[in-house]
């Protein structure tokens, strides 16, 4: 290779941009900081397992749903324990109803599901408060009266009677035998 005239040295022009330090074996004053550096463990992920448990989502608690379905099976409404509607399910049979009929049917079934859920609140409160207070028969009667009258929660029997009445009057179906069998 021929060197251009005036280029007598053995290095290229880009050597001026090499800012790296020359490799030396001399100890640097910064080497003393190595004594204070955190020790790297072989199981680095194991140290973080405790933090993962804090950030992982727990399984969502399974909510108890209270569902009522009309006798035709065209409308089902599921509510949460507080009476809020969680899910409305319609089958193909609902297509034969007009919009107004369907809205009315959903409303009626949702009200029954709400009563069923609120009756569960009644049972929950009477059982749990009764356990906490160890009430006698008179105290239990007062507690049931308080929960029923003050909180306006129906008993499970009242909710079942309301469902039987609606089904008997609205659909000409006798469901009283169904509720007597549960006794």
From Swiss-Prot:
One Gene Ontology cellular component: plasma membrane
Q: Which domain of life is it from?
A: Bacteria
Q: Where is this region: Disordered?
A: 1-32
Q: Where is the composition biased (Acidic residues)?
A: 1-16
- This protein is called ESX-1 secretion-associated protein EspH
Taxonomic lineage of the native organism:
Bacteria, Bacillati, Actinomycetota, Actinomycetes, Mycobacteriales
GO terms of biological process kind: response to antibiotic; symbiont-mediated perturbation of host innate immune response
What does gene deletion cause? Inactivation does not abolish EsxA (ESAT-6) secretion, EsxA-specific immunogenicity and enhanced virulence.
| Organism (species) | Mycobacterium tuberculosis (strain ATCC 25618 / H37Rv)
Gene name tied to this protein: espH
